[in-house]
UniProtKB/Swiss-Prot annotation:
One of its GO terms (biological process) is symbiont-mediated suppression of host antigen processing and presentation. InterPro entries: PPE_C, PPE_dom, PPE_sf. This is Uncharacterized PPE family protein PPE38. It comes from the Bacteria. The gene is PPE38. Belongs to the mycobacterial PPE family. The lineage of its organism: Bacteria, Bacillati, Actinomycetota, Actinomycetes, Mycobacteriales.
Length: 391
């Protein structure tokens, strides 16, 4: 460090020491140490007075003596710490004083700058050598500035080192906080161990009791009469099944009867509708093939009756008149065309086919369909009846 100061010109040494914070922080540190020392000393005095008052006053006995013995080292440590704080404050003050001395011994940077400016001017104007003595004197002054700064820095270094060497480290308190923490940890560990030891049998008993509970539940479930319960349920369902079967049959019968009733009602309605027409035809004589029912267009056929078996029938009956001769003028009971029976309706009778020679072979379908429950069916005669003319 001395070598560094020696090799540095005054421009650097002077600029460093004057550009720093100065001795203010050192004096502030010294004041803080002094305050700490005063607080420690006051605490030690107060603690000692309290312990002494308790031991000499109402608190007496072995506990009082033990407490006083335990507090004595702490009081001593407080007093020692207060002394060390006072020493640190003194050393900080000494360091600040050394700095002030070094600062005062160091050449001011302005003087160094002036010397360098003067040297430059003398060299610039030294045309004939007239400034040589002045230049030498200026250089000598500069060397002295160099030496002065180095001496100041060396002295400051020596003073700061002496201050640092006289400082002693603070002693640790007599109360071992780590020991207390370890002791508390050991106590907590012991408590946890004891609690675990106390709870282990309970937990083991609970775990061991679980299989027994499961086995008991399984045995109870196995003992339940599940099959018997199912059989009882099936037996309880038998009456319902027995009742549902006849009810379904009755429902089907009702449906069939409804269909038959509708068909009968339809047949009865048709017959009832034809009764007035039939009666009117009888009264007027047109329903039996009279002149009023046939019209003027059928006058050529009035004398030609149709034969159904051994019975003569009017030519207006459906089935006895050829399809080509049918006319809308034929009004009457026999002129109604045969209807195709609907599904589920009364069964009508188809018109019987014509026999050989053009003779009719059966009853009209309209008459056969209105015959009621027991219609009279006229069987066809398998013979050829000759046609007999009128007049």
């Amino acid at each position: 460090m001395i070598l560094d100061f020696s090799w540095l010109p005054p421009e650097i040494n002077s600029a460093r020491i004057y550009a720093g914070a100065g001795s203010g922080p050192l004096f502030m540190a010294a004041a803080a140490w002094e305050g700490l020392a005063a607080d420690l000393r006051a605490s030690a005095s107060s603690f000692d007075a309290v312990i002494a008052g308790l031991a000499a006053g109402p608190w007496s006995g072995p506990a009082s003596v033990a407490m006083a013995g335990a507090a004595a080292p702490y009081v001593g440590w407080l007093s020692a710490a207060a002394g060390q704080a006072e020493l640190s404050a003194g050393q900080a003050t000494a360091a600040a004083t050394a700095f002030e001395a070094a600062l005062a011994a160091t050449v001011h940077p302005a003087a160094v700058t002036a010397n360098r400016v003067l040297l430059g001017a003398l060299v610039a104007t030294n045309i004939l050598g007239q400034n040589t003595p002045a230049i030498a004197a200026t250089e000598f002054d500069y060397v002295e500035m160099w030496a002065q700064d180095v001496g100041a820095m060396v002295g400051y270094h020596a003073g700061a080192a002496a201050v640092a060497e006289t400082l002693t480290p603070f002693s640790v308190p007599p109360l071992d906080l780590a020991g207390l923490a370890s002791q508390a940890g050991a106590q907590l560990t012991g408590m946890a161990t004891s609690v675990s030891a106390a709870l282990s049998p309970i937990a083991e008993g609970a775990v061991e009791g679980v299989p027994a509970v499961v086995a008991a539940a399984q045995s109870v479930a196995a003992g339940l009469p599940v099959d018997a319960a199912l059989q009882v349920g099936q037996a309880a369902a038998y009456p319902a099944s027995m009742l549902i079967g006849p009810m379904m049959q009755l429902a089907q019968m009702g449906t069939t009867a409804n269909t038959a009733g509708l068909a009968g009602a339809e047949a009865a309605g048709l017959a009832a509708a034809d009764v007035p027409t039939f009666a009117g035809d009888i009264a007027s004589g047109t329903g039996l093939g009279g002149a009023g029912g046939l019209g003027a267009g059928m006058s050529a056929e009035l004398g030609k009756a149709r034969l159904v078996g051994a019975m003569s029938v009017p030519p207006t009956w459906e089935g006895s008149v050829p399809a080509r001769m049918a006319s809308s003028a034929m009004a009457g009971l026999g002129a109604m065309p045969a209807e195709v029976p609907a599904a589920g309706g009364p069964m009508g009778m188809m018109p019987m086919p014509m026999g050989m020679g053009g003779a009719g072979a059966g009853m009209p379908a309209g008459m056969m369909g209105r015959g009621g429950a027991n219609p009279h069916v006229v069987q066809a005669r398998p013979s050829v009846v000759p046609r007999v003319g009128i007049g």
